[in-house]
Structure formats: structure tokens, C-alpha cells
Amino acid sequence: MSDNKWLRNGFVWMILIIAAIAVWVTFVQGGRGGATITTQEMAADIKAGKVERLVMTSGSDEIQVQYIGTNEVRTLRLPPNVDIFELLKTFGIDPQQVDIQTHRASQWGNVLGTLTFLLPTLFLIGVIIFMMRQAQGTNNQALSFGKSRARVFTSNRPTVTFDDVAGVDEAKEELQEIVEFLKYPEKFAALGARIPRGVLLVGPPGTGKTLLSRAVAGEAGVPFFSISGSEFVEMFVGVGASRVRDLFDQAKRNAPCIVFIDEIDAVGRQRGAGLGGSHDEREQTLNQILVEMDGFDSSTNVIVIAATNRPDVLDPALLRPGRFDRQVVLDRPDLHGRLAILKVHTRGKPLESDVDLEDLARQTPGFSGADLENLVNEAAILAARRNKKTIGRRELYEAIDRVVAGPERKSRRISEREKLMTAYHEAGHALVARMLPHADPVHKVSIVARGMMGGYTRVLPEEDRFFWTKKQFEAQLAVFMAGLVAEELVFQEVSTGAANDIERATTLARRMVTEFGMSERLGPLAFGRKEELVFLGREIAEQRNYSDQVAYEIDQEVRRLIDQAYQTAKQILLDHMDKLEKIATLLVEKETLDGHEIEALFDEPRPRPELVGPPLTRPAALIATPETARPDSPSEARPAAPVPHIKPQPAS
């Protein structure tokens, strides 16, 4: 490809040089001749004694007439087949009276004279050839529309192995068998095992689906074809199906190999009913994929690995056994997974001795593998910005805030009242989160603007959580409302800074009622049905499957939950107004507080939730002490103890 480019550029430069030479020859040769003169004028000047000499060039019909006492030179062009001596005699001039000199023609002069006529012709021919080559390239591009755009990674490239993938141990075990099959297919054929046609990797963005598929190819040492689902379909009809055929033809020629289709939901969506009579190019591409995956020979060692974060919209024919035999789920890593991922991404990076990766993993719940990689990279950039040779705790923990909330905006100037209002707002969040047993502990509070936020309060669970209880949701609602309540109690008005808190609280309360069945009034029912439109994809619209009366009751339950959270937050802040002022004052002074600084303001320990159930279901840290436990108490469910410092509020 590069050689053709150099040839094409060289051809263009050659044409330009030839054109420049032609222009130069034309102007220079024309300039040397000077003004022209007729034969009558020359004869008159000779008779008048003005001409010093006549200069002739052999083989040329031009004569240079040089005048006495001046540098003027005029050019006479002889008629065809006319001799200068005969011409002078015709005008009655003796040739002996004139100094006539004859010079041999220069070889370069002949060449330049020839080029004067030849170069324009060569230039036109070159332009025509160049245009023909361009047209030929355009035709080739048009014919290559049906070719696959897959990128091929072979064994001579830097490989990714399972050692570079962490936090997805179960997925690696599932895919280890794929590696075994690609390496030793006869081992499975001897037992009559069927070749696995495809593996579907399902998981949220950033969980390592693409990385894991490349690790499979790296472990097996086979070619790896990578293509995105959106690269199949173009503006021309039939291009998608043609590219699918070409992709699988290449894969068969390079077997054993792996074909990786990223974001397969771009072409693998469930086929519709064909409403409107339109021809859906995407459906034809999907049909071709189904045919190709079902048309493999049993001896063809080609495995298709696809990745998607929307498995619910895929066509059932694509998911049946015989096409994608296995579905491997990749979820966000837990504490141990995050620790393993951090060890992989910090490999080869100079860390300071005080860096605790386990503590870092504990402070990043919900982070995906891509988030953790970005965190380590941001920390390295911060260290380089500060001209450090190593990455320390300060950079890593600051990188967490950058990933979660965005970079700091310390240059933004705000008034003292707005700064104080932000401090009380965030102090309200922190205080209510600290006093509620079922709320997550406060980790960090800051009034430094980050991203689009004027301040933020970070709470972290004590352990990984996969389920939420009603009490935890109610505590979270109270924490959401605490900022607004703090502004109202201190300043007797509320600001727009609580808009996002209100939106999140309303959304959570509505989901508690309509999705999670956490309403005592409406019971464990799910309200609202997802409308599956056949030609637009799934979950486009939500249809009400309940009456207006039920809709009114849903709104009332949402209002009741929000009001209850509001009253809970208000009671806590009223009972601990001194702590609210201390936290706000420290925030104005330091701008950022961690959980230990907030905990130091309290004399009593943080309230712990009282869990009901068999002791084996309770975390060790939350089991009641022998002084408070009653061995003879029954194990059936008991009413939960009231939240400390909160007066019971009647339901509205």
C-alpha cells in the first residue's frame, strides 16, 4: 500500500516538473530572441550602415541582427527554403559588406527545442493517465464494498493472555475450554463432543468482554478476526450480507481461528413483523449470520465470540443452541475482583510504599475493570503533572474523585453566602447518613466544585452489596432529602442545589412502589408494562396496565415515602443542630473532610442496624453482644427497633 502511494506521488511530481520545464523553455527561449524584424527593415538598416553583424545558427531559420553601438538584437525569421546570401543579393546588397557569422547548433538547444513541442503533449498524456488510474481506483473501491472490514490479529502481534484479565474467574474457566478445543480438537472429537459454534459475552460496558476474547485468542495462539456489528451495514443494499459471507470465508481459510463480533446487538436485534413493507437491510445481515453459523462443517475449527450489553433485544434464533451455545455473564467485580484488577493495572508502575491496593479496592465499589484502569491512569497522569517519580496515595485517591465526580474547579469564584449554603447542604447529607443505622457510612464530604456539581458527599458500603432492603432505601431517601432540609432550617429557604437530590429521591420512591413491591398500601405488585414494538426494538415505551385510581394511589405512596424521608431528615438535623454547624464550619475552613474527621465530632459510636433472622445470616460485626442478646428469645421475626433520635411520624 505504501509503495503504491509513493509511486502515485512520484508520478504527480514528475508531471509537475515536466510542466515547469516546458514553461521555462518557452519563456526563456522566447526572451532570448528579442524583437522581430522583417527582411525589408533588415535590408534598409544594412544599407544605412546600422547593422554590425548577422548571426546564424546551423539548422535554424532564425537570424540574429546585431546593431552598431547598441546591445539591441532583433530576430529575422527566413522564409522556407531561402538562403540569406541570395536574400541580400535580391535587395542589392553585397554579402561581403556584412559580417555574417554561422554558429553550430548546441546539443542542449536542440533538446530544449524538441522539449518545447514535446512537453505539452507529454503533460496532457500524463493527466489523462492519472485520471484513468483514479477512476480505476474508484471502481475498485465500489467493488470492495462487499468485502469484510474485519481486523486480523495474528500470532506475531503482542498477545493478551488470561494473566492480563482479572476479576472474572468464572468467565475465564468457561472460556478455558474454548482454548482447549482450539489447541487440542482431537481430544473432544474422540469423545464425540460437538464443536461449540459460538460464545456470547454478556455484561455492562467496561467489564472486559473485548479483552477476554483477545485473551482467548492469545492463549490459543490462533488468528483473531475483530469487527463491530455496526461495520456490516452500509448505505447499499446487500452489503451487510456480502460482508458476512466474506468474513466467514476468511475465517474458514485461516482455521482454526476466532471471529469476534463486538456490539452484536447492532445487527442481531429481534426481527420485526415487516410492517410498512420496507426492506430492512439489518435483517438480511442477521439472516446471513444465522445461515453462516449454522453452515459450519463439523471439522471447521472456527469459533464465534460475540459481545453485547443488551442481550434482551437479541433475536431468539441467534441465541439457540447450535449458534451461541454458551452465554458467559461478566458483571462488575466484587472486592476481591477489584483488588486483582488493580494489581494487573499497577503492574510495571512505580508505586509508593504506603499505597494499599486493598483499601483502594474497598473504596471503589461499583467500578468496572475499565473504570479501575482509568483510575490508575489518571493517578499516573497526576503524578507526572506534579513531577513525581512514583504514584502515591494522594494521586490514587484524588483519581477516584476525578473518575466519580470529574476534575476540580477551584478557579470558580462563588460568594460567601453560596459557599456557606453549599457547606450546610453537604453537612446535612453527611449528618443524616452518619445517624441512620441503615445508611452507608460517610467516606468524604467536599464543597469543592467538580464537574457539574457544586459539592458532593460520598458514602461507601462496608461490604459489597447485591441486594437492597426497604430500610436501606428509606435511609437513602432521607439522605437525599437532608441537603434540602438543612438549607430550609438554616436559611429559611431552599436553592436549586437540591434539584438532583429531589429527582433521585422521586425516582427511587416510585421504583419502590411500582417495581420492588415495597408499598404496604398497594402490596407486592409490579405496575407498568414495557411495550415491545416489533419494528423499533424492545423497551421503547411503557404502557399503563392499571387504572386511574391505582395511578392516584401510586402517586400518594410516592408522596408518603418522600414526606417520611423529609420528616426523618428534619428530626435528625433538629436533634443534632450543633453537629450540623460544626461540620459546616469545618467544610468552610478546610473545603474537604474525610469520614474520620466527621466521626471525631461524635462521642457515641455510629448506630448499627439491628438485623432480624438466624445468626448465620448476620455479618459478624453486626451480631448482638452477649449483654444485649437473649438466648431464649424466639427466632421468629420481631419488629425492628425505632431509629435513634427520631420521633415516630404519622403516615400522611
Curated annotation (Swiss-Prot):
Assigned EC number: 3.4.24.-
Membrane-side (Cytoplasmic) residue stretches: 1-9, 132-652
Annotated keywords: ATP-binding, Cell membrane, Hydrolase, Membrane, Metal-binding, Metalloprotease, Nucleotide-binding, Plasmid, Protease, Transmembrane, Transmembrane helix, Zinc
Subcellular location field: Cell membrane
Cysteine pairings via disulfide bonds: none
Cofactor: Zn(2+)
SMART domains associated with the record: AAA (SM00382)
Chain residue ranges for the region called Disordered: 623-652
GO-annotated cellular components: plasma membrane
Top-level taxon: Bacteria
TM annotation in the entry: 10-30, 111-131
GO molecular function, one term: ATP hydrolysis activity
Residues noted as binding Zn(2+) in the record, renumbered to the chain: 425, 429, 501
Membrane topology, as annotated: Multi-pass membrane protein
Active site (catalytic residues): 426
Location (main, coarse): membrane
Composition bias type Pro residues, residue spans: 641-652
Segments in the Extracellular topological domain: 31-110
Subunit structure: Homohexamer.
The protein's role, per its UniProt record: Acts as a processive, ATP-dependent zinc metallopeptidase for both cytoplasmic and membrane proteins. Plays a role in the quality control of integral membrane proteins.
Family under the similarity heading: In the central section; belongs to the AAA ATPase family.
Name this protein carries in UniProt: ATP-dependent zinc metalloprotease FtsH 1
